[in-house]
Amino acid sequence: HVSQRNASTPNPHFPADMIVAEQKRRENIVEYLLYMWQVEDLIRANALDSDRIRRTLVARYDVTDDVRKRIAQWYDNLADMMRSEGIVEHGHLQINRNVVILLNDLHLSLLRNPQETTYGALYYKALPSIVRLRAKSGGAEMTEIETCLTALYGYLLLRLQGAPVSPETLEAVREINLMLTFLAEKYKEERDITHPH
C-alpha cells in the first residue's frame, strides 16, 4: 500500500535519493511518482541552485565522494530538465507526466474490463470524493488519476507540516489510497509480465 512515510519523505537509510527513486519505481509506481513530485519541490525549494542543493540535500548522506557526485549529478540533471521544460515554479517533469499518462491508461483499461470487478468497486467507492476534488480544483484540466494523485500528495504535505486534516478529507484519502494501491499493484503485475528480470 501507499505508505505515508515512504511516499512523503526520503528514507535516510538508503544511500541516495536516486536509489530510493529507482527502488520505488520497481516496487510501487504511485509511491515513486509522489516521491518524484517531492523531489521536484525540494529542488524548487533550493531555487534549482546546484550549490544549495549540494548543501541541503546531497550533504546529508554519509557516502563516498564518488556516490555523492552521482547524487549531485542526479539532482543537477533534474534541475536542468525543470529549467528546459519551463516548470521552475510549478508543474511536473515530462518523465513524471508520462507516468501519470500510463497510470491513467491502465485505470481506463481496468474500468473497461468486466473481469476487473475489484478495481471497479474501489473506483466507484472513491468516485464521490474524486468528483468533489475535481470541483474544488477550479476546473483544472486533470484526469481522474491525476486528481487522485494530487489529492494524495496534498494530504502527505499536510501531514509533513503537521496541519490538521478534516475527517472528510481523511475518508477521501483512504478511499483514493485503496484505489491507487490496487492500480499500482496492477501496474507492477503488467510490468513484471512485459519486462521480466
Regions flagged by a language model, labelled:
Residues 55-56, 97, 124, 170:
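Short, charged, amphipathic alpha-helical segments
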Residues 19-90:
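N-terminal interaction modules that seed assembly of large macromolecular complexes
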Residues 74-77, 102, 125, 129, ...:
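Charge-rich, solvent-exposed alpha-helical interaction surfaces
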Residues 11-13:
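Intrinsic-disorder-associated, low-complexity terminal segments enriched in Asp/Asn/His/Tyr and depleted
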Residues 20, 62, 70, 79-83, ...:
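A structural motif
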Residues 131-197:
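Glycine-rich, aromatic-bearing surface loops/beta-hairpins
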Residues 93-153:
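A charged, amphipathic interaction segment
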